From Swiss-Prot:
This is Messenger RNA-binding inhibitor of apoptosis 1. Disruption phenotype: RNAi-mediated knockdown results in increased apoptosis and increased sensitivity to DNA damage-induced apoptosis in response to ionizing radiation in the germline. Residues 79-157 are annotated as: KH 2-like. It comes from Caenorhabditis elegans. The lineage of its organism: Eukaryota, Metazoa, Ecdysozoa, Nematoda, Chromadorea. Coiled coil: none annotated. Its main location: cytoplasm. It comes from the Eukaryota. The gene is mina-1. Expressed throughout the germline and in oocytes (at protein level). Residues 12-76 are annotated as: KH 1-like. One of its GO terms (cellular component) is cytoplasm. The KH-like 3 domain is required for binding to RNA. Residues 328-393 are annotated as: Disordered.
Length: 393
């Protein structure tokens, strides 16, 4: 006789994709763990269905109740996020809003606490389902968090093929005047209101006794109102034109406006820009009126080095970046049999001539001149080199 107990049949229920994404978040995982301990069951998401299996023998689990709890918490979480965004939008000065793929959004969520701590921004709100990442704080803090997020994504996924939107102002910048309870508005005195609109007894409307001054004197009433009006009541005459109010700028004008672009190039190609005493870099800087900084101190795990381009406008930054990338592409297209030693002395370089780095005495020679060759060193250096003594001496 077989005494084996039958395996409990799982209960399945369809759930939407957004609710499924909520259950994958830390808050949703904690809620699922709490429900499993409370109902003594196992909750699993298979494709688009919520599967619940009872852990206790002979105890049925109501999957509808579990689904209702999950849905209520999920909806309350969305409402809390909306309230949180509205409060941050009114309390912070700047915001950075971007849409990322889900894999990118997961990396940002993993490092969100570190990004917020190092950039000192007010808050970072991340929605994994839509890939929406929103950063709030001051202008400096949000810009710092944006740069750190770009560097973090570049470290994990390589060069980004998407543009992260720049920092924008929030609605708080529109509210320049705050409420001051010490400043009172100028209202007509109560005596004037009582004289114009006599109410009589408090319960006059409930009693048959009419108020003391029930007869309205229209000329007197219009004269009283005329004194407290800004413009006369004669509408045939248009009101006088007032001088337009000069709106003060919200922020002081910037005295130094610069644009900055960061581009990653292969580490093996850094010598093309910095070779020959950085002649190519200086040429690009003079041509496009910009400053190029190659951050060789940055240790990258995927073999790329950041190049920072600072100019007065975006057009100059874009042109300088295109020049750098065309230089990299021109050297990558060359055959490997004749590799150049620097980016400036190459005949095929788009910025130089054929005889730019050769000395006058070497130009007539057909042999290619190498600056680092041992035979091209002065003979004085060879004479001053100490001789090596043989072991027999």
């Amino acid at each position: 006789m077989d005494d084996s107990t039958p395996y409990p049949v799982p209960q399945e229920l369809y759930i939407p994709q957004k609710m499924k994404a909520f259950m994958a978040e830390p808050q949703g995982c904690a809620l699922v763990a709490a429900l499993e301990g409370q109902f003594q069951c196992s909750i699993v998401v298979i494709n688009d269905h919520l599967s619940v299996i009872s852990s206790a023998d002979g105890v049925a689990v109501d999957i509808n109740q579990i689904e209702k709890i999950l849905r209520d918490v999920w909806r309350k979480r969305d409402v809390q996020i909306m309230i949180r965004e509205a409060a941050l939008n009114a309390s912070c000065t700047h915001i950075c809003h971007t849409l990322l793929p889900r894999a990118y959004c997961a990396v940002v969520l993993f490092f969100s606490s570190d990004l917020q701590r190092r950039s000192r921004c007010t808050d970072i709100i991340i929605d994994q389902f839509t890939g929406k990442v929103t950063m709030f704080g001051t202008e400096q803090a949000v810009n710092k968090a944006r740069e750190m997020m770009i560097e973090c994504l570049t470290e994990h996924f390589g060069l980004l093929e998407m543009n992260i939107p720049p920092t924008q102002r929030t609605t708080r910048m529109g509210y320049t005047n705050s409420y001051n309870p010490e400043i009172r508005t100028h209202l007509p005195p109560n005596s004037f209101l009582n004289s114009v609109f006599p109410m009589g007894e408090p319960n006059a409307i409930l009693t048959s006794t009419p108020p003391t001054t029930s007869i309205m004197d229209e000329p007197l009433l219009s004269a009283s109102l005329e004194k407290h009006l800004l413009f006369p009541s004669d509408f045939s005459v248009p009101p006088p034109r007032l001088s337009p109010v000069q709106e003060l700028p919200l922020t002081p004008p910037k005295t130094c406006v610069v644009e900055k672009i960061k581009q990653w190039i292969p580490t093996t190609e850094v010598g093309k820009i910095l070779g020959n005493r950085a002649a190519v870099k200086k040429h690009i800087e003079r041509q496009f009126n910009c400053v190029i900084t190659v951050h060789t101190e940055v240790q990258s795990s995927f073999g790329a080095t950041p190049v920072e381009i600072v100019a007065q406008n975006k057009e100059q930054c874009q042109e300088a970046r295109n020049a750098v990338m065309s230089l990299m592409q021109s050297h990558q297209d060359k055959p490997a049999s004749n590799p150049p030693d620097s980016g400036f002395s190459t005949p095929g370089s788009p910025f130089t001539s054929d005889s730019s780095s050769t000395t006058p005495e070497k130009r007539g020679n057909s042999r290619q001149y190498h600056r680092g060759s041992f035979r091209d060193q002065p003979k004085v250096m060879l004479a001053l080199t100490p001789r090596k003594l043989s072991p027999s001496d």
